[in-house]
C-alpha cells in the first residue's frame, strides 16, 4: 500500500470516500452520529481542545470563559463542530460561517469578526504565521462542551482498510500520538491573509 496525500475541501471529504476518489480521511474529523451513517471510523487517535483566535490588540486576549464573548461576533468553519459550538455562548453574534481558515483569518484581521473558533493545533499554526493574532484557552469548566476526539474515516463497509489502519493506530502510544501531532502542527502550511 502506498500513501498519497491529497488536498480536499472539507465538504468534499465524505463524498470523496463514498465515490472511491480517496481511501481515508485524516483531517481532524470527529465521528459524529450523522457521519457514522455515511462512513466508518477508527477509534479516536487524538483529542484536541477548542480555543478562539483573536487579534493581539483585542481586549479578548485575557478572557477565561466562553461567556466573556457575549455580544461579540464569533465565526467558525462551515459544516464543522467549530461553527456549531458558537451557539453555546449566550448572547453571541454568531457570524456567518466560512469555507476555510484562510478566509476566517482574513476576516478576523480585517475586523469582520471579533474571534474565530478552532481546535488548538489549527490555532497554533495560524498564530505561528500571523504575528497579529493569538489564541485564548479557557479555564477548566468554562470552555466549550463538545467531543473533540478525532478519528480516521473510511468508506462505509471497507473493513479491510479500517482494520489495517486501526491496527497501525493501536501500535502507537498516546504520548507518541501527541508528539506526532505537535510535529504536524510545525509542518503545516502557513495560514496568511
What are these regions (language model features)?
Residues 1-28, 37:
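Extracytoplasmic small-molecule ligand-binding "clamshell" domains
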Residues 4-15, 61, 96-110, 121:
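Short helix-initiation/N-cap motifs at beta->coil->alpha
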Residues 12, 28-38, 85-88, 109-110, ...:
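A ligand-binding cleft/hinge motif common to bilobed small-molecule-binding domains
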Residues 17-18, 69, 108-109, 165:
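Hydrophobic residues within well-ordered alpha-helices
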Residues 23-24, 114-115, 151:
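Short, Asp-centered acidic motifs that coordinate Mg2+ and/or phosphate
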Residues 47-54, 120, 124, 128-169, ...:
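Periplasmic-binding protein-like
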Residues 55-73:
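Flexible hinge/capping segments at coil-to-helix
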Residues 81-98, 134-140, 166-193:
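Ligand-binding clefts/hinges and TM-proximal coupling segments of bilobed small-molecule sensing domains
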Amino acid at each position: 500500500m502506498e500513501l498519497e496525500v491529497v488536498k480536499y475541501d472539507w465538504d468534499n471529504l465524505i463524498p470523496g470516500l463514498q465515490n472511491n476518489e480517496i481511501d481515508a480521511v485524516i483531517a481532524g474529523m470527529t465521528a459524529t452520529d450523522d457521519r457514522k451513517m455515511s462512513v466508518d471510523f477508527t477509534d479516536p487517535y487524538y483529542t484536541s481542545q477548542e480555543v478562539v483566535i483573536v487579534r493581539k490588540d483585542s481586549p479578548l486576549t485575557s478572557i477565561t470563559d466562553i461567556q466573556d464573548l457575549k455580544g461579540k461576533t464569533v465565526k467558525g468553519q462551515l459544516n464543522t463542530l467549530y461553527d456549531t459550538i458558537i451557539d453555546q455562548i449566550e448572547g453571541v453574534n454568531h457570524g456567518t460561517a466560512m469555507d476555510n481558515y484562510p478566509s476566517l483569518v482574513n476576516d478576523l484581521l480585517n475586523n469582520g469578526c471579533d474571534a474565530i473558533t478552532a481546535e488548538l493545533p489549527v490555532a497554533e499554526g495560524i498564530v505561528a504565521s500571523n504575528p497579529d493574532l493569538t489564541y485564548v484557552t479557557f479555564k477548566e469548566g468554562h470552555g466549550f462542551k463538545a467531543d473533540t476526539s478525532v478519528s480516521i474515516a473510511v468508506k462505509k463497509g471497507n473493513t479491510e482498510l479500517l482494520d489495517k489502519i486501526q491496527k497501525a493506530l493501536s501500535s502507537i502510544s498516546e504520548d507518541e500520538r501527541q508528539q506526532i501531532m505537535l510535529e504536524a502542527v510545525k509542518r503545516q502550511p502557513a495560514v496568511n491573509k
